UniProtKB/Swiss-Prot annotation:
Biological process according to GO: 'de novo' pyrimidine nucleobase biosynthetic process; 'de novo' UMP biosynthetic process
Any GO molecular function: orotidine-5'-phosphate decarboxylase activity
UniProt-annotated catalytic positions: 62
Protein name (record): Orotidine 5'-phosphate decarboxylase
Pfam family, one: OMPdecase
Length: 240
């Protein structure tokens, strides 16, 4: 899939995760996102187990520390053979560059280097929070754009941002720079704790490279049907 749909496996127990995954068809090569909760509970072994079954893994740990620590951590993550992983863009260019170096150095010979994605502003962040709690003088769109340019200069492969911010800035970046967007909700689904959301089709039209979808699939009465409907909306213009 050239423009992946990552299913967010936001569970607190791996038995629940496997129960969900076993409800899906065509699991070989399926793109999934594994976050902090599962990784911190089960460690690298859960990544190896998913990888052994053919899943393409987005390991979302949002690293944010001094450059040397991030580099050494990225070196370890690269050995797991994940598709991509994340750092916080707010960690600065030196930290992002260190993460990239760690991934390159830690990737086994003959294997692809995991893609490095920089998280800009979380999709739970509103204009009010940015101004009143983070004390940022820029509006959200400009802040995200600034962090995106910083990430590109630091040789990240792409960014994580809201689907609402992609359209206005995509033309300023190279074609291979990735815009991975969570905050994806079908029209019939409530926003829950996400402040900046779009439908899969809207994200595609705005220029998203990949989308991340969790609860609308994992909590659906029929996960396979929900996945297929979201994938259809996300992929509807592929033939054009």
């Amino acid at each position: 899939m050239n423009k992946p749909l990552f299913i967010a496996l936001d569970y607190d127990d791996q038995e629940k995760m496997w129960l969900f995954l076993n409800q899906l068809k065509d699991k070989q090569g399926l793109h999934v996102k594994l976050g902090m909760e599962m990784f911190y509970q089960y460690g690298p072994e859960i990544v190896r187990d998913l990888s052994a079954k053919g899943y393409q893994i987005f390991l979302d740990l949002k690293l944010h520390d001094i450059p040397n620590t991030v580099k050494r951590t990225a070196h370890q993550l690269a050995a797991l053979g994940v598709y991509c992983t994340t750092v916080h863009a707010l960690g600065g260019k030196q930290m992002i560059q260190a993460a990239k170096e760690g991934l390159i150095e830690g990737t086994p010979a003959g294997k692809p280097v995991p893609k490095l994605l920089a998280v800009t502003e979380l999709t739970s962040i509103s204009e009010e929070v940015l101004k009143n709690e983070q004390h940022c003088s820029l509006n959200l769109a400009d802040e995200v754009k600034s962090l995106a340019h910083q990430a590109q200069e630091a040789e990240a492969d792409g960014i994580i941002c809201s689907p609402l911010e992609v359209k206005a800035m995509k033309s300023e970046f190279s074609d291979d720079f990735m815009f991975v967007t969570p905050g994806i909700r079908p029209k019939s689904y409530q926003k829950d704790d996400q402040a900046r959301v779009a439908t899969p089709g809207q994200a595609r039209e705005n220029g998203s490279t990949a989308i991340v979808v969790g609860r609308p699939i994992t909590q659906a009465a029929d996960p396979q049907k929900a996945y297929e409907e979201i994938l259809k909306d996300w992929s509807k213009n592929d033939a054009k």
